[in-house]
């Protein structure tokens, strides 16, 4: 596994495994164990996923030492504000039977994220978290937070895929020394991404799948992708991206697919903000 060095010196795997929507406890534990066995070391969960306990059980059962794993969770907005955020992280540690998290993110850029972020800073100083960051913070919110804190976020996890390439986000995250991480690198299969002629053609050129091409494209842009699957053979396939390199021409060809639009929703849409803030997770 290759690694990125975050702005505080912590090393983070360049590819991670996400467990969003894997709610069944036994299935979640199985897929995390399979992912670790396949070679993943970065495991990404969240308070809102409802599977922290299952992920924790898998971590306890694996033979891979804890210090070789990079475990991420995210604080949901119902736990924002200084006190609630701090308590919620301790509760997540207890659920997962962990002494520390490698990374904790604020899940959404709404409500009292400044207060919640101050809680993460204190937990970071106490050694309960090795690195802190945010998720879904588009450039305006990221800059707002970065200019109002003593500890600049180490990571910002946002939607990035060939149809939503986040060029502006990459510029501003790089400017402030924030590592960009990609959720939904495959757009959850939307818009025919796996049968896209351009991506299929590039994959054939390197004898790689569309998924491998997308993950390689992200890695070459300096972005850490979070792949998600419940099939072990696909987990292994998604890690097999370090034996080839996309040409500059192919990188530009993929860049031409950008529609600069989310495959899911816009965090700038008032209706989306109302929906997210109304979720009681």
Located regions from the model:
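Alpha-helical scaffolding within the catalytic cores
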Residues: 1-4, 53, 57-59, 89-91, ...
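N-terminal binding-site loop/beta-alpha segment at the start of enzyme catalytic domains
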Residues: 1-69, 186, 280-281
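CE4/NodB-like, metal-dependent polysaccharide N-deacetylase domain
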Residues: 7, 85-105, 122-126, 178
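Acidic-and-aromatic substrate-binding clefts and catalytic sites of carbohydrate-active enzymes
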Residues: 22-26, 46-54, 78-83, 109-114, ...
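Short, acidic/polar
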Residues: 23-36, 80-96, 115, 140-142, ...
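A structural motif
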Residues: 40, 98-101, 129, 153
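A short, structured active-site edge motif that brings together acidic residues
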Residues: 66-79, 102-109, 136
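Beta/alpha (TIM)-barrel catalytic core signal, keyed to glycine-rich beta->alpha loops juxtaposed to Asp/Glu
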Residues: 108-281
């Amino acid at each position: 596994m290759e690694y990125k060095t975050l702005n505080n010196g912590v090393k983070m795997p360049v590819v991670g495994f996400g467990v969003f929507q894997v709610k069944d406890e036994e299935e979640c534990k199985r897929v995390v164990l399979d992912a670790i066995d396949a070679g993943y070391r970065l495991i990404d969960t969240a308070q809102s996923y409802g599977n922290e306990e299952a992920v924790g059980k898998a971590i306890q059962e694996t033979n891979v030492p804890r210090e070789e794993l990079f475990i991420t969770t995210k604080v949901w907005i119902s736990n924002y504000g200084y006190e609630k955020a701090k308590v919620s992280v301790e509760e997540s540690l207890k659920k997962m039977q962990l002494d520390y998290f490698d990374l904790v993110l604020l899940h959404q850029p709404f409500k009292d994220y400044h207060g919640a972020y101050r809680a993460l800073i204190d937990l970071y100083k106490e050694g309960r978290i090795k690195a802190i960051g945010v998720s879904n913070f588009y450039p305006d919110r990221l800059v707002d937070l970065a200019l109002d804190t003593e500890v600049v976020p180490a990571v910002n996890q946002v939607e990035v895929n060939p149809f939503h390439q986040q060029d502006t986000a990459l510029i501003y995250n790089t400017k402030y020394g924030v590592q960009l991480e990609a959720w939904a690198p495959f757009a959850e299969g939307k818009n025919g991404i796996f049968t896209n002629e351009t991506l299929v053609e590039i994959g054939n050129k390197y004898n790689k799948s569309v998924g491998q091409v997308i993950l390689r494209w992200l890695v070459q842009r300096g972005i850490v992708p979070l792949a998600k699957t419940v099939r072990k053979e696909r987990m292994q396939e998604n890690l097999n991206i370090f034996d080839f390199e996309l040409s500059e021409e192919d990188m530009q060809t993929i860049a031409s697919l950008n529609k600069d639009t989310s495959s899911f929703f816009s965090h700038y849409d008032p209706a989306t903000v109302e929906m997210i803030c109304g979720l009681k997770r």
